[in-house]
């Protein structure tokens, strides 16, 4: 899966690496407890927190209940800002909103879930708000939905680069030097 993802987003195998960590487990009932008593859930939360602070986590695919936990912590970028109206419109009911933010995309019954045998209940993918590689994370979304040409085409790399340029410089770019 890692090699397919890296190839799918156009990554350079000489300098980039994709790591898929399927060993993390969380008890959704434990997420509602204070303090969290389940040791596996504590370990998984600590691992994810470490990845986030090290800027090593760009997106997460989680069960909806766990995804909600992270949404409540503002862990995910607003996809309306990253993808634009066209992509969000093309995704339609797959856009997952929480607290008025388009924070994820449901993956239930996608070719991606079927091909890789993802067994999560109601899987949702979100781009981590602190990711330093949001363009690659958007590329991941494009790759996941490439079987749906209308959705994949809505992810414009040029529009995304212009948006990032504006975000980093605080000004609108004319698009010529993006």
Regions inferred by a protein language model and the residue ranges of each:
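Structured segments of extracytoplasmic/periplasmic soluble domains
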Residues: 4-12, 51-55, 69-73, 82, ...
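Extracytoplasmic "Venus flytrap"/periplasmic binding protein-like
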Residues: 42-99
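Short amphipathic alpha-helical coupling segments at ligand-binding clamshell hinges
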Residues: 132-143
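Extracellular/periplasmic bilobal clamshell ligand-binding domains
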Residues: 165-178
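A bilobed periplasmic-binding-protein/Venus flytrap-type ligand-binding module shared by bacterial periplasmic
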Residues: 119-133, 152-154
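Periplasmic-binding protein-like
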Residues: 88-126, 144-163
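Extracytoplasmic/periplasmic/luminal assembly and interaction segments
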Residues: 2-65
